């Protein structure tokens, strides 16, 4: 198994030319992952209001180079009488370098935010039209040292519902990359029957 420490694995797998092909449709199609990035953050107001993180949405306002500026809110039922209800913050996210900032108070002096890194690489892959795979089943997905799936990696596994990128296949095994919550990237063999292609369009926000 290969482990990359604290280095966004997108920089290991894509050339800079790939970034220019991202379109507005891609940002719309992959919006659920940006929502997850923001919802998992340590933004002060999200914590103070104890907002249901499942209701948080990041509505993209502008895009400049790799930076996305978005309005973050949680009220799905806003009316013309209360247009600002549910507003949380303005955020800027660099989808290449995986950097999230709160720019609500002072855009020139933003607050650096932490977030769940599992969604960063998935969002990037989605924007670049890479095939995303999701772990299925009810049990943990075991990592193996070989494509025969005969030698398990001790203590290394992925939970159902997580996302992975498939690099290559061999028989009934797939060599995958998985980015953990702390940003560490793991690469190893898994049982191909435990992963399936995932289409972002299948989820309605």
Regions found by a protein language model. Give the residues of each.
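Exposed beta-strand-loop-beta-strand "reactive/processing" segments of non-cytosolic proteins
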Residues: 53-96
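Core beta-strand residues in small-molecule sensory/regulatory alpha/beta domains
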Residues: 75, 141-146
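N-terminal signal peptide c-region/cleavage motif recognized by signal peptidases
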Residues: 13-20
